[in-house]
Amino acid sequence: MTDICDANKFKHRFRGYFPVVIDVETAGFNANTDALLEIAVSLLKMNSDGVIVLDRTLHFNIEPFEGANLEPAALAFNGIDPTNPLRGAVDEKVAFLEIFKEVKKAQKAADCHRSIIVAHNAAFDLGFVNKAIERNGLKRSPFHPFASFDTATLAGLAIGHTVLAKACKMAGIDFDNKEAHSALYDTERTAELFCLIVNRWKALGGWPLAAVEDDSDSTSE
């Protein structure tokens, strides 16, 4: 069994997984064909009382990969001009190598064996992340390839709304609609929402469990 002190660590709270909050902005909905244009990654930290908070955020504007599709409707929606030199965009591979380095460093510091993506409507972000990793031939990704924490689902359960802006406002988190659809802004609001839900569950007595079974013999997936 895990005592309360040990339960207040990422490695026990999420079964050895280190939660990493991610948001992407893209030029469409198809991860196979449409460009990844922006990504932000928020790293979290947990204090000795088991309360999690936003630690820091990495942010990259991304150059569309060669041959990428750019849907005009998607660009109009997120307001991104991929040709604007002021974006300071970098190659996908450059961004992901830096993300891998920083995530692995934080994961190791938390004594976790793998990282797990947290995102709002996580299947979308995870799909684009996985495709970018595959497209660039990157190995040893810190991220679980298919498991994730979806804050849309969590917010629907805990707060009663699945839309990020409305869930944040209902939870008392400031949300500026004019800043929305920026990966940097949305990631940090998603991180705040995830932390609030996890911390509230703990405050209500949902964690730690009275008795936690040792699952060391179960699959790591």
From Swiss-Prot:
CDD domains: RNaseT. Its cofactor is Mg(2+). InterPro entries: Exonuclease_RNaseT/DNA_pol3, RNase_T, RNaseH-like_sf, RNaseH_sf. Residues 20-194 form the Exonuclease domain. Mg(2+) 1 binds at residue 23. Pfam families: RNase_T (PF00929). One of its GO terms (cellular component) is cytosol. The keyword Transferase does not apply. The active site is at 181 (proton donor/acceptor). Homodimer. This is Ribonuclease T. It comes from Shewanella frigidimarina (strain NCIMB 400). The lineage of its organism: Bacteria, Pseudomonadati, Pseudomonadota, Gammaproteobacteria, Alteromonadales. The gene is rnt.
